[in-house]
Amino acid sequence: MIEIRDISKKYRETFVLRHVSTRLPSDRMVAFIGSNGAGKSTMLNIISRLLEPTEGSVSIDGRELRKWDSRELAKTLTILGQTLHTPARLTVEELVRFGRVPHSRGRLENQDSLQIDKALELTEIADLRHCYLDELSGGQRQMAYIAMAIAQDTKYIFLDEPLNNLDMHRAARIMKLLRSLVREQGKTICIVIHDINFVSFYADYVVAFRDGVLCHQGPTEDIIRTDVLRDIYGMDIAIEPYGDKKICVYYE
């Protein structure tokens, strides 16, 4: 379980997060939602130890984040950020291998190769394994980085807008894949995401931010409501039933 206790973050005199406290459920897909600048990515970076909070603390599995050894932490959580730097002469397979570094220390064994092959197959880019990253489309590169995150094979996976640059087919494929990692392997996935219909269909739990404050949280069905979404986004969003799920309509 991830426990967030009274987290605040400010840059100079401006707070981007204010006194956020919550517990993120394990073995679930947790969606961080909210408008641009609400604090979602900042919180994701704090719980992955990429960013130090101004106040407060985070614990993972009962241990304060600051007390984790870096290598042990890298075997426990994966973080895929919004900004991805692309080394020009690196192949897809070479990139995905980096996901195994915390486990192999650079010396790949059979188990590492199996994880790499599995990640390439799951993301449907095995045929691109020998292609250089700078030869790929933005969507294909995004899939390669997601494959790297999957190859790391950690209990916790943190993804900041992983659907960027993906077409509808690939975006839906990735969300289904992430859900299967939760259901079949017991992963805990925290995802920053703007498409609330993907949230409605695939997330188990939602944490919503507004102006740096945690304004709503709970099971997805408790958040996908017109009154709650209006409070989060400041706009009217129609909700229509679709089987046992809900579709949000916000184009009018």
Regions found by a protein language model. Name each.
Residues 33-35:
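The feature captures the beta-strand-to-loop junction immediately N-terminal to the Walker
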Residues 48:
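Helix-to-loop junction immediately C-terminal to a conserved catalytic motif
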Residues 56-64, 73:
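Conserved ABC transporter NBD signature motif
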Residues 97, 110-128, 153, 158:
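Conserved ABC ATPase "signature" region
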Residues 132-136, 140:
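Conserved ABC ATPase signature
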Residues 232-252:
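ABC ATPase nucleotide-binding domains
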